[in-house]
């Protein structure tokens, strides 16, 4: 059985060698960003997000912390912080999973099958249950405003100002969710 440090290195190296765009924070394998594309055949298709991942020292026995940096409208994701509902992560997490599973299975399934009974975003949950067409329209609006390729590229590459990640926040008056690392 390998140590947690070795497992972290192995899983992050697999992710770095995959097709995902990964950026380590200060060359630290326990904190990084991944560019994530919304799964096809879902309302999130075409969306591009920057996902912040932090691996605890107890990884893989303890689940990673996952958060969307640019905004997403989803019942199980906090709209302002971008945090993914811990219950959702912890209920499905197993030490047998690796970081590739997070981006190829876990996050696509979360977006494909939102759980309105365990919401972090009450508005999204209520709309999904009561007015699904309005919910899907709002998801598409958020993708157009916060998760298109141009904005994701700016978000992924902007290192000039800690307080802004893209020009969209100053144009719309909305804040983009999550902290921005100045080295990113």
UniProtKB/Swiss-Prot annotation:
Pathway noted in the entry: Protein modification; protein ubiquitination
Superkingdom assignment: Eukaryota
Keyword ATP-binding: yes
Protein keywords: ATP-binding, Cytoplasm, Nucleotide-binding, Transferase, Ubl conjugation pathway
Catalysed reaction equations from the record: S-ubiquitinyl-[E1 ubiquitin-activating enzyme]-L-cysteine + [E2 ubiquitin-conjugating enzyme]-L-cysteine = [E1 ubiquitin-activating enzyme]-L-cysteine + S-ubiquitinyl-[E2 ubiquitin-conjugating enzyme]-L-cysteine
Spans annotated as Disordered: 154-184
Active site location: 85
Descriptive protein name: Ubiquitin-conjugating enzyme E2 8
Organism, as annotated: Schizosaccharomyces pombe (strain 972 / ATCC 24843)
């Amino acid at each position: 059985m390998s140590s947690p440090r070795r497992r972290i290195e192995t899983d992050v190296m697999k992710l770095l060698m995959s097709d995902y765009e990964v950026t380590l924070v200060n060359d630290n394998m326990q904190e990084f960003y991944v560019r994530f594309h919304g799964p096809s055949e879902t309302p999130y298709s075409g969306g591009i997000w920057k996902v912040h991942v932090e691996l605890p020292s107890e990884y893989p026995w303890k689940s990673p912390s996952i958060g969307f940096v640019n905004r997403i409208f989803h019942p199980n994701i906090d709209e302002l912080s971008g945090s993914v509902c811990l219950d959702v992560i912890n209920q499905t997490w197993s030490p047998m999973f690796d970081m590739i599973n997070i981006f190829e299975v876990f996050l696509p399934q979360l977006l494909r099958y939102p759980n309105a009974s365990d919401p972090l975003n009450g508005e999204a949950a209520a709309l999904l249950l009561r007015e699904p067409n309005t919910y899907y329209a709002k998801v598409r609006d958020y993708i157009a405003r916060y998760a298109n390729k141009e904005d994701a590229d700016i978000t992924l590459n902007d290192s000039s100002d800690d307080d802004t990640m893209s020009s969209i926040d100053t144009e719309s008056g909305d804040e983009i969710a999550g902290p921005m690392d100045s080295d990113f």
